[in-house]
């Protein structure tokens, strides 16, 4: 669950990163930002990364994911569908910051250049 106190309380962040940006998103969430991370249907592939609690890899026992996922909210979305792409666009509109990695999940469904023109205050961080 997102933290409600901290230096970044009230800042809304959309996390579209992959493993290259997941730690930065965790740090921002730990500082109080409301970080939302969409996942593909079936869950984020990072949920399968070991080690796993009691050696069982079922998508909910990844110790790696448990650490990096703390303080954030997750939801499933399919950005290849019109409905999923629209969900992501609405999230961008409500965000103060969008974290991306070139080619990461959901970035193809969102035109961040247009979003920046419509929301000049939007901060886009692209991690390589």
What residue spans do the PLM features occupy?
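N-terminal helix-loop segment corresponding to the beta1-alpha1 unit
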Residues: 1-128
């Amino acid at each position: 669950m997102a933290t409600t106190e901290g230096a970044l309380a009230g800042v809304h962040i959309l996390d579209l990163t992959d493993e290259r940006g997941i730690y930065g998103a965790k740090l921002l969430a730990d500082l109080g930002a409301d970080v939302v991370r969409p996942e593909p249907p079936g869950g984020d592939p990072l949920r399968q990364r070991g080690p796993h609690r009691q050696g069982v890899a079922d998508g909910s026992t990844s110790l790696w994911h448990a650490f990096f996922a703390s303080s954030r909210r997750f939801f499933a979305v399919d950005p290849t569908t019109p409905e999923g792409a629209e969900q992501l666009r609405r999230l961008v509109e409500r965000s103060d910051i969008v974290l991306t990695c070139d080619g990461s999940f959901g970035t193809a469904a969102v035109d961040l250049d247009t979003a920046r023109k419509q929301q000049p205050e939007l901060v886009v961080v692209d991690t390589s």
